[in-house]
A protein has these predicted regions:
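Active-site-proximal cap/loop segments of hydrolase catalytic domains
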Residues: 1-163
């Protein structure tokens, strides 16, 4: 998810119709600077420690999606978070979406859905999980058919004239 979110900051406008960011790790710098988070110190072995190494800090800042949001057009983005996620805290996608919404100059929409009963793996229970999948598929379909009309009776997409 980190890679997809970082690409959204760098890709030419219009390259992607949409992006689904499912529990995205987007605030790399702040997370890796917080030694009180349970997964941060063990991750320093792989990522490096930005607290003690300025080069690691600068490297993380260079690719961290949250730190690289710029005034530009972004694709439609659906960010999903879980309130009880121990890996990607719920405020990461929330902060990222807020920054995108206040900074972007076009494109979108950029929306956030926080599941108040879920962790990193999403909803539990068959029907709750199916509802999450339906939301993601519906968003993807809406992005793919933007500018087109979906004929639900025939299951086909018809071109729609631009105005």
């Amino acid at each position: 998810m980190l890679f997809r979110s970082a690409v959204a900051n760098r890709a030419p406008p219009g390259l992607f119709g949409g992006l689904i960011a499912d529990v995205p790790f987007v605030d790399v710098v702040n997370t890796m600077l917080d030694a009180d988070l349970p997964l941060t110190p063990p991750e320093w072995l792989e990522w490096g420690n930005p607290i003690t190494d300025p080069a690691v800090f600068e490297s993380m800042r260079a690719y961290s999606p949250y730190d690289n949001v710029a005034p530009r057009s972004y694709p439609a983005i659906l960010a999903l978070g879980g309130l009880t996620d121990p890996r990607v805290t719920y405020w990461e996608p929330a902060k990222w979406v807020a920054r995108l919404q206040s900074t972007m100059t076009g494109g979108g929409p950029v929306v956030l859905k926080t599941n108040m009963q879920a962790g990193h793996g999403g909803a539990s229970g068959r029907f709750d999980r199916l509802a999450e999948v339906a939301l993601e598929y519906g968003f993807a379909l809406a992005c793919a058919t933007r500018g087109a009309a979906l004929d639900t009776t025939a299951g086909t997409v018809q071109g729609k004239a631009s105005s």
